[in-house]
Amino acid sequence: EILACTTLGLEHHKTVKWIIEVAALNAKQIIQLSALIKNLVISNFKEEHYASVFVKSSTGFYKTKNNLPNGATRETIILMLENASPLPVKAAGGVRTLEEAIAMIRLGVKKIGTSSAKSIANNALSQSDY
């Protein structure tokens, strides 16, 4: 399914984002899924297409026990970057401040998914629970 859906997206000149919902996974599973997506893309597509296939950390909707972070934590993003490269990583879920956004960019993410863009741009604290 990963191969078929990636092919369909790329054939239509779209960006493909594979959401692995890291809050539902352990470190080993994050590594395995990131590597699986990377290996399928590298084995089946030209290097020029790599930049159009993202591995994304979260939808932002996954409910965790005890309100633990549900997406882009430093630890999960590092695992994704180390195992998805050369595919780009999109940090999503829980990036709510300018400091968090800068930290993700410094780690190497290529995109950030956030409902707090205005607050981040204004360097203000987000009021969003989304």
Question: PLM features: residue spans?
Answer:
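Catalytic cores of alpha/beta
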Residues: L25-L36, L79-P86, V95-K111
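Glycine-rich phosphate-binding active-site loops on the catalytic face of alpha/beta enzymes
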Residues: S43-N67, G93-Y130
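Amphipathic, non-transmembrane alpha-helical secondary structure
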Residues: L3, T7, I31-A35, R74, ...
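Conserved hydrophobic beta-strand within the GNAT/NAT acetyltransferase core sheet
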Residues: W18, V89-G93
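Conserved anion-binding
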Residues: E1-T64
